[in-house]
C-alpha cells in the first residue's frame, strides 16, 4: 500500500466511493475482456492484411490504435477500484487519466474524419477528391495525435493523486475530484477549450456531414447500390457512438466543471449529485472502444472478408482433424488404412489459403 504520512497535517477521512468503485470494476472488466482482443485483432487486420490502402481504413486503423491504448491502461484502473486506493507510483495515475482523455477526444475526431470522408466522396466527389488520398489521411491522423498529445500535458499535470485517511492510515486516491483551487484556476478554461475542439466541433461536423449525405442519398436520382447501404450503416454507427458514448459524458462534464468552478452557483449537495451522474457517464465514454470494432465489421467489407478468410483455414483444419480421428477409430483393415491415409494426406497437403477468401480492393467500395 502506498502511504504518504505527514507530520504537518492530518488528511481528511476518505469519502465512501466503494459503491461506484464496484460498478466501475464490473463495467471496465467487461470492456477490457471484450475491447482488448477486438481492437488488437482490428489493428492486425488493418496493418497486416488490408495494408491500410483506403482513406477510411487509415482512419479506422488509428481509431483502433487509440482504443487499444485505452484498454491496455484498464488493469491500472481495475486494481484501483478493487482496492479502493492507488497502490502504484503517482505518475501512473497521471498517465492513466491522460490516456482516457486522449482516447475520448481522439475517438471523436477519428470518427469525424470518417464521416467527413464519406461526405466528400458522396456530396462533393470531384471538388474534394484531392483531399481523399491515403497520404493526406495519414497527415491528418498525425496532426490529430499531435493535438491530443498537447492536450494530454495539462491532463497529466492535473491528475495528481490526493491523500486521505482510511482505517488510521494515509492512502492515495486517483480519478476522483480535483481541488476547488484547481477548478477555479486553469482547469476550467482548459476543460472548456478541450470540449470545444475535441467534442463540440466534431459533433457538429458529424451531424452536418451525415445529414448532407443522407439527403443526397435520399434523392430520387441517387444511385442505389451496395456502396450506398455500407455508407448509411457507417454513418449511422458513428452517430450512435457519438450520441450514446460521448454526448452524455461531455455534457455532464461541462455542467460539473461550471459548478465546481463556481461559474454557476450551486450547493455542495447539487455538486455531489452531478458528480455521481458523471461517474456513471464516464463508463459510457469508455465503452466506445468496444463499439468501434462493430463499426469496422459491419461497415468495412474488406475487414469482414479478412475475418472470413481467417476462419476458413481454422474450419478446414478442424474438419481434417476430425476425419483423422474417425479413421483411427475404424478397424485397421487394408482398405480402411488406405482410406485413412488418403483423407489425412489431403487435409495436410491441400490447406485452404487464407488469402484466397478475399481480394482487398484499393477503392472505396472495399473499405
From Swiss-Prot:
Q: What is its main location?
A: membrane
- Topological relation to the membrane, as annotated: Multi-pass membrane protein
Which residues carry a glycan? 4, 170
Q: Where are the transmembrane segments?
A: 26-46, 55-75, 96-116, 136-156, 187-207, 239-259, 276-296
Q: Highest taxon of the source?
A: Eukaryota
Protein family (similarity comment): Belongs to the G-protein coupled receptor 1 family.
Give a short account of what the protein does: Receptor for lysophosphatidic acid (LPA), a mediator of diverse cellular activities.
**What name does the UniProt record give this protein?**
Lysophosphatidic acid receptor 5
Amino acid at each position: 500500500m502506498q502511504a504518504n504520512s505527514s507530520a504537518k497535517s492530518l488528511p481528511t477521512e476518505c469519502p465512501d466511493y466503494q459503491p461506484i468503485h464496484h460498478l466501475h470494476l464490473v463495467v471496465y472488466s467487461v470492456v477490457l475482456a471484450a475491447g482488448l482482443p477486438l481492437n488488437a485483432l482490428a489493428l492486425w487486420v488493418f496493418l497486416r492484411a488490408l495494408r491500410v490502402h483506403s482513406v477510411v481504413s487509415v482512419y479506422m486503423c488509428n481509431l483502433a490504435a487509440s482504443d487499444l491504448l485505452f484498454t491496455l491502461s484498464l488493469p491500472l484502473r481495475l486494481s484501483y477500484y478493487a482496492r479502493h486506493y492507488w497502490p502504484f507510483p503517482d505518475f501512473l495515475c497521471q498517465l492513466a487519466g491522460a490516456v482516457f482523455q486522449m482516447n475520448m477526444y481522439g475517438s471523436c475526431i477519428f470518427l469525424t474524419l470518417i464521416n467527413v470522408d464519406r461526405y466528400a466522396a458522396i456530396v462533393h466527389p470531384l471538388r474534394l477528391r484531392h483531399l481523399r488520398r491515403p497520404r493526406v489521411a495519414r497527415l491528418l491522423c498525425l496532426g490529430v495525435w499531435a493535438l491530443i498529445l498537447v492536450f494530454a500535458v495539462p491532463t497529466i499535470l492535473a491528475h495528481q493523486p490526493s491523500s486521505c485517511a482510511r482505517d488510521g492510515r494515509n492512502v492515495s486516491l486517483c480519478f476522483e475530484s480535483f481541488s476547488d483551487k484547481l477548478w477555479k484556476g486553469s482547469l476550467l478554461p482548459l476543460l472548456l477549450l478541450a470540449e470545444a475542439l475535441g467534442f463540440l466541433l466534431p459533433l457538429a461536423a458529424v451531424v452536418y456531414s451525415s445529414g448532407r449525405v443522407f439527403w443526397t442519398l435520399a434523392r430520387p436520382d441517387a444511385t442505389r447500390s451496395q456502396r450506398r447501404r455500407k455508407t448509411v450503416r457507417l454513418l449511422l454507427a458513428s452517430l450512435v457512438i457519438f450520441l450514446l458514448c460521448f454526448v452524455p459524458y461531455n455534457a455532464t462534464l461541462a455542467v460539473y466543471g461550471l459548478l465546481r468552478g463556481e461559474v454557476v452557483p450551486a450547493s455542495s449537495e447539487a455538486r455531489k449529485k452531478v458528480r455521481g451522474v458523471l461517474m456513471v457517464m464516464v463508463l459510457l465514454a469508455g465503452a466506445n472502444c468496444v463499439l468501434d470494432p462493430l463499426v469496422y465489421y459491419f461497415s468495412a467489407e474488406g475487414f469482414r472478408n479478412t475475418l472470413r478468410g481467417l476462419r476458413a483455414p481454422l474450419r478446414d483444419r478442424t474438419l481434417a482433424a476430425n476425419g483423422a480421428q474417425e479413421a483411427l477409430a475404424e478397424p485397421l483393415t487394408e482398405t480402411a488404412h488406405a482410406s485413412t491415409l488418403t483423407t489425412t494426406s489431403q487435409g495436410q497437403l491441400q490447406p485452404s489459403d487464407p488469402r484466397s477468401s478475399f481480394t482487398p480492393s484499393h477503392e472505396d467500395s472495399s473499405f
